[in-house]
C-alpha cells in the first residue's frame, strides 16, 4: 500500500519511482482518490526532475491501462493494425488521405483522433464538416468498420485512457504541459490503447509546431520512439516541416475538399504529398506490408492511381453515417462561406518566412477553430490557395483566398494573414519537408 504524498516526496527528492508506485498514483487519478493538488505536485516534480526510461514506460503503460485497451484478436484480421499520430500544425490534413491509402494497401487503421485547439486544426473537426459524419460510433460499430473498410477515424471515448484526461486538465492550468515525459505518456497512452502493432509519429518542426525549437521536437520524437518500443509497439518518427502551412488550405471544409481532390488525383500539393507518402511508407514498412521504401512507394502510388484509396475514403464516410456518394459529390455536401475573396500583400516581394501559428490563429478568428475547448466551430471558413515560401507576391498575386461569413471577420483575417508573411527581395533557403527519420 502506498501513500500519494510519499510518492510525490520520493520524486521531489530526485529518486526514481517504481512501476508499482506509478501505477498506484495513476489509478488514484482515475478513481478520484488522488487530489488535484497532488496531481499538480507530482507533475511539477516530474517537470523539474525528468524521468528515467523505465519510469516513462511505466507511466505510459499505467495511463494506457487506466481504461479499456482494444483487443482485435476475435476479428482475425489479415493484416497489421497501424496508426499515425501528429503533434499538430496548420493545414495538416494527412490523416484523411493516409488512413485510406494504408487500408487500401492491406493495413487496418483504427485512428482515434482529436479536436483542434489554439492554432492547430483537429481531424475530428474536419470530418464533422461532412454532413452526418459520426465520430463516436459504439464499440461494435467501430470494430465492424475496421473489419469491413480497413479504416475508421473516431474521437476518444471516456473509456480510453481516462486517467490522462484528468492529469492533462491539471497540467494545463499548472504550467506543466511542456514536460517531455508527460507529453510522451499522454500521447502514447491513447495510441497504445488502440491495440496497435505499429505506430508512426509525425513530429512537427518550425513556426507552426507544438515544440518551439528543432532540438525540442527531436527530443520529443526520440522519447516517444523509445517509450513506445519499450512498451512493445514498433514505432518510428519523422521530423517534418511546419514553417509554412502544409496543405494549400487551412480550415475544416476547405481541407476536406483538398483531401478528396488529393485522393482522386484532381490536385496534389507537392509538400502534402511528400509528407503523406513518407508517413504511409513508415506504416507499410513497420506493419510488414512492404519489403523496402521503393516497394512501399510503388504500392501507395498504385492505390492513388487506380482509385482504390479514394474508394476506401468514400466507404469510410458512408460507414460513419456520412453521404454514400460523398467522393463524387463532395462540393454539394460541404458547407461554403458566403464571402470568398483574395488577400494581397501591400507591396511586392518574395515570401521569405511565415508565422504559421499566426496563420492558424487567423482561421480561429474567422470562427474555424477554438480558443477554448467549449467553443463552437464554423466549418465553412478558412484559407485556400495559400502562397508558399519563395513565392513572389504583389498587388496582383494573392497571399491566400479568405473564406469568411462577414466583411468584418474577413478584414481581421486579412490583417492577420498579411502580418504573418515576411517579404524580402531574395528567396529563402530551401529546407527539407522531412528533416529526419528517428528509429530506436
Curated annotation (Swiss-Prot):
UniProt keyword Glycosyltransferase, yes or no: yes
Cited InterPro entries: Glycosyl_Trfase_fam3, Glycosyl_Trfase_fam3_N_dom, Glycosyl_Trfase_fam3_N_dom_sf, Nuc_phospho_transferase, PYNP-like_C_sf, PYNP_C, Pyrmidine_PPas_bac/euk, Pyrmidine_PPase_CS
UniProt keyword annotations, A-Z: Glycosyltransferase, Transferase
Example of a GO MF term: 1,4-alpha-oligoglucan phosphorylase activity
Pathway annotation from the record: Pyrimidine metabolism; dTMP biosynthesis via salvage pathway; dTMP from thymine: step 1/2
EC identifiers of the protein: 2.4.2.4
Catalytic activity: thymidine + phosphate = 2-deoxy-alpha-D-ribose 1-phosphate + thymine
Stored Pfam families: Glycos_trans_3N, Glycos_transf_3, PYNP_C
Gene3D superfamilies per UniProt: Nucleoside phosphorylase/phosphoribosyltransferase catalytic domain, Pyrimidine nucleoside phosphorylase-like, C-terminal domain, Transferase, Pyrimidine Nucleoside Phosphorylase, Chain C
Gene Ontology biological process terms in this record: pyrimidine nucleobase metabolic process; thymidine metabolic process
UniProt GO cellular component terms: cytosol
Function summary: The enzymes which catalyze the reversible phosphorolysis of pyrimidine nucleosides are involved in the degradation of these compounds and in their utilization as carbon and energy sources, or in the rescue of pyrimidine bases for nucleotide synthesis.
Family: Belongs to the thymidine/pyrimidine-nucleoside phosphorylase family.
Quaternary data: Homodimer.
NCBIfam families per UniProt: PRK05820.1, T_phosphoryl, Y_phosphoryl
Name by which UniProt lists this protein: Thymidine phosphorylase
Organism: Serratia proteamaculans (strain 568)
Amino acid at each position: 500500500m502506498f501513500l500519494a504524498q510519499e510518492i510525490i516526496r520520493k520524486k521531489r527528492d530526485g529518486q526514481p519511482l517504481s512501476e508499482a508506485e506509478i501505477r498506484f498514483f495513476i489509478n488514484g487519478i482515475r478513481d478520484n482518490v488522488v487530489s488535484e493538488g497532488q496531481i499538480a505536485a507530482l507533475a511539477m516534480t516530474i517537470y523539474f526532475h525528468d524521468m528515467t526510461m523505465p519510469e516513462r514506460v511505466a507511466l505510459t503503460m499505467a495511463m494506457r491501462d487506466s481504461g479499456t485497451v482494444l483487443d482485435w484478436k476475435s476479428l482475425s484480421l489479415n493484416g497489421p493494425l497501424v496508426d499515425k499520430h501528429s503533434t499538430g500544425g496548420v493545414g495538416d490534413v494527412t490523416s484523411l488521405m493516409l488512413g485510406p491509402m494504408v487500408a487500401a494497401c492491406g493495413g487496418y487503421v483504427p485512428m482515434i483522433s482529436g479536436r483542434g485547439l489554439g492554432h492547430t486544426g483537429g481531424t475530428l473537426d474536419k470530418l464533422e464538416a461532412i454532413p452526418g459524419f459520426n465520430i463516436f460510433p459504439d464499440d461494435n460499430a467501430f470494430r465492424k468498420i475496421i473489419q469491413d473498410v480497413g479504416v475508421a477515424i473516431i474521437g476518444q471515448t471516456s473509456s480510453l485512457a481516462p486517467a490522462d484526461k484528468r492529469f492533462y486538465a491539471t497540467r494545463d492550468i499548472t504550467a506543466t504541459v511542456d514536460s517531455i515525459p508527460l507529453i510522451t505518456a499522454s500521447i502514447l497512452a491513447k495510441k497504445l490503447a488502440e491495440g496497435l502493432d505499429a505506430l508512426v509519429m509525425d513530429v512537427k518542426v518550425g513556426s507552426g509546431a507544438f515544440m518551439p525549437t528543432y532540438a525540442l521536437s527531436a527530443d520529443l520524437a526520440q522519447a516517444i520512439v523509445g517509450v513506445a518500443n519499450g512498451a512493445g509497439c514498433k514505432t518510428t518518427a519523422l521530423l517534418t516541416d511546419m514553417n509554412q502551412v502544409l496543405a494549400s488550405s487551412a480550415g475544416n471544409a476547405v481541407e476536406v475538399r483538398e483531401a478528396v481532390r488529393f485522393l482522386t488525383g484532381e490536385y496534389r500539393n507537392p509538400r502534402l504529398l511528400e509528407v503523406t507518402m513518407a508517413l504511409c511508407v513508415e506504416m507499410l514498412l513497420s506493419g510488414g506490408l512492404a519489403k523496402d521504401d521503393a516497394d512501399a512507394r510503388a504500392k501507395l502510388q498504385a492505390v492513388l492511381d487506380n482509385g482504390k484509396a479514394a474508394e476506401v475514403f468514400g466507404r469510410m464516410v458512408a460507414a460513419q453515417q456520412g453521404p454514400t456518394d460523398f467522393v463524387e459529390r463532395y462540393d454539394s455536401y460541404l458547407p461554403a462561406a458566403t464571402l470568398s475573396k483574395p488577400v494581397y500583400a501591400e507591396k511586392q516581394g518574395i515570401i521569405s518566412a511565415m508565422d504559421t501559428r499566426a496563420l492558424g490563429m487567423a482561421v480561429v478568428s474567422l470562427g474555424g477553430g477554438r480558443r477554448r475547448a467549449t467553443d463552437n466551430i464554423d466549418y465553412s471558413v478558412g484559407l485556400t490557395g495559400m502562397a508558399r515560401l519563395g513565392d513572389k507576391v504583389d498587388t496582383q498575386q494573392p497571399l491566400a483566398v479568405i473564406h469568411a461569413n462577414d466583411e468584418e471577420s474577413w478584414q481581421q483575417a486579412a490583417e492577420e494573414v498579411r502580418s504573418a508573411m515576411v517579404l524580402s527581395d531574395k528567396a529563402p533557403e530551401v529546407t527539407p519537408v522531412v528533416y529526419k527519420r528517428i528509429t530506436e
